[in-house]
């Protein structure tokens, strides 16, 4: 049986590093599509030679995206931003990219598209971040029937900012808890 190929969009980030390590241990061949691939060479050290391919991808170039995805069995979208910049807008990153990836999956022989969203994604949210995440889910699901949406809240791991912050706060006599009515569904990488 041939190794399955998994293309990971945004695979050079915090979640991607752990995901790539686990997938290559299960004999997947990983194509990692990321900005500034020349800075992500360390990812190749996580597996045997040839198991990881890095592709430098401009998120505004969907023909490059098609090239990265076309021979895959599974595509995972990890691309996301927490705040907008002059060049990166929520709508483009969270909605247009998942839509384009899902369309390419439907035109190709892709078995599954896994789209990582966010726990509070909602069309009625006051947050542009949450609205754009919801739009991305809808567009991915509309364009490829084998789309799976994952909605994590906080992602925890040895290098994360969240648990390390709480570790530092633990020396205080009191730890403030804000927003106790919010959903909290952490995932460990």
Language-model features: where?
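Short beta-strand/turn micro-motifs composed of small residues
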Residues: 10, 34, 117
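Conserved glycine-rich Rossmann-like NAD(P)H-binding loop of the short-chain dehydrogenase/reductase
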Residues: 28-38
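Conserved Rossmann-fold NAD(P)-dependent oxidoreductase catalytic core, especially the SDR/UDP-sugar
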Residues: 29, 81-82, 90-143, 147-154
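A conserved pocket-lining segment of Rossmann-fold NAD(P)-dependent short-chain dehydrogenase/reductase
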Residues: 168-189
């Amino acid at each position: 049986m041939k190794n399955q190929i998994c293309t990971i969009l945004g695979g050079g980030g915090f979640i991607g590093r752990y995901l790539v390590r686990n997938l290559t241990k299960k004999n997947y061949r990983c194509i990692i599509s990321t900005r500034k691939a020349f800075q992500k060479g360390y990812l190749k050290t996580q597996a045997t030679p040839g198991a990881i391919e890095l592709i430098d991808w401009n998120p505004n170039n969907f023909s490059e995206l098609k090239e990265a995805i076309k021979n895959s069995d599974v595509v995972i979208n990890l691309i996301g931003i927490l705040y907008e910049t002059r060049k990166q807008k929520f709508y483009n990153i969270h909605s247009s990219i998942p839509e384009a990836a899902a369309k390419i999956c439907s035109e190709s022989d892709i078995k599954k598209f896994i789209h990582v969203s966010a726990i509070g994604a909602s069309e009625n949210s006051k947050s542009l971040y949450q609205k754009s995440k919801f739009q991305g889910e809808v567009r991915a699901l509309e364009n490829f029937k084998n789309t799976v949406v994952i909605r994590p809240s906080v992602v925890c791991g040895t290098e994360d900012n969240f648990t390390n912050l709480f570790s530092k706060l633990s020396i205080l006599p009191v730890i403030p808890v804000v927003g106790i009515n919010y959903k909290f569904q952490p995932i460990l990488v």
